[in-house]
Amino acid sequence: MRMTAIISEYNPFHNGHLYQAKIARQETGADLIVAIMSGTFTQRGEPAFTDKWTRAQAAVASGEIDLVLELPFYFAVQRADRFALGGVTIAETIGAESLSFGSECGQLEPFIEAAAENQEATPRYQELMQEGLARGLSSATAASHAFREMTTTLDLTTPNNTLGYYYARAASTITLHTTKRIGSGYHDLSTGDIMSATAIRAYHATHHSLIGLPELTAETLRNAVFASFEPYYPFIRHRLLTTPLDDLMQFNGIDSSLAPRLIEGARKNETFDNFMTAVKTRRYTRTSLQRVLIYLLTSSKSSEFENIAFDRIDYVRPLAFNDNGRLALREIKQRIPVISTFEKHPWLIKESHVTAAYAVPLARYDRLEEHRRFAHFAGSVSK
């Protein structure tokens, strides 16, 4: 079967995602589309809009996604280059012939050229990075500014282009394909037929209804429990105010400069938004801080990440699939173990802890039993 992969979060799956999957299927000649989707927490360090099982089921219900595989926590809640490398590693390991991604650019050649230039290895890039860091910028912001100074063929200040660049850097055996993003941009909160996931979540927060989704996807999500960061803040605050300083610095991303700042912010602020306003700086951006807080919430220590190889995976885990996806899983099993039931794999044990950290603040105790969850089988889904 000719397989095209899409690295995704589907937070939630919306009309723009549906458009991308349709175009990817048409232009790559794919027999099936497999989504490699982050789980309960996202790349930007946010609790997913709803749990991974429901999001995966909603994607398959659209009729364009045949199989959803989980992007493990260690790959998912990461800066862009590691997120991309982890996703590409899975796509190539399962035998996908193509990797499709949305981009603001919409043309593949600039990504190939930028990746081949490898500007990150040049002295000029390193000089610009150091200048940015010296001005108090975060690593991600300093990198964005450096790329802006050096690159003329590709705008790497936009989120989808940035991920596309790192996909191109990571790709070894897979053919790349890009679809121009249509409709709202990532941070655009305007409403319409094709809205950003950010706008859909914001609209739901104020109107308590879902718009901008395919009909069958919306139906799947109708009775879901939706998350925001606010219910998690009391748990994060408790840990910040009760953990000794030296122990706090064992968590991934927390150093001697950040730890006191987090403690002071937690001591003085009763809401998550006020806490973030007090703590974030040019160096500590909201996104990087959110990832740190997720590491804290999930008890993820720096030592856990020391031996993570982002270019290697020894299992895949399906979250949802249809008849076409089931056929694909048979082929994938010839390449790599497919874990559909819970096993005592260290990463799956971690996933159970991560799922508990996601579920308890939402009082979703029915979602605690990760070891009893099976991939959702949708059967035949009409397109």
From Swiss-Prot:
Record has Nucleotide-binding as a keyword: yes
Coiled coil feature spans: none
Annotated localization: Cytoplasm
Gene Ontology process terms (BP): tRNA modification
InterPro entries reported for this sequence: Rossmann-like_a/b/a_fold, tRNA(Met)_cyd_acetate_ligase
Reactions performed catalytically: cytidine(34) in elongator tRNA(Met) + acetate + ATP = N(4)-acetylcytidine(34) in elongator tRNA(Met) + AMP + diphosphate
Annotated positions binding ATP: 7-20, 102, 160, 181-182
Enzyme class: ligase
A Pfam family of this chain: HIGH_NTase1
EC number: 6.3.4.-
Domain of life of the organism encoding this protein: Bacteria
Keywords: ATP-binding, Cytoplasm, Ligase, Nucleotide-binding, RNA-binding, tRNA processing, tRNA-binding
Keyword RNA-binding: yes
GO CC field: cytoplasm
GO molecular-function terms, A-Z: ATP binding; ligase activity, forming carbon-nitrogen bonds; tRNA binding
Protein family membership: Belongs to the TmcAL family.
Protein function: Catalyzes the formation of N(4)-acetylcytidine (ac(4)C) at the wobble position of elongator tRNA(Met), using acetate and ATP as substrates. First activates an acetate ion to form acetyladenylate (Ac-AMP) and then transfers the acetyl group to tRNA to form ac(4)C34.
Protein name as it appears in the record: tRNA(Met) cytidine acetate ligase
Gene: tmcAL
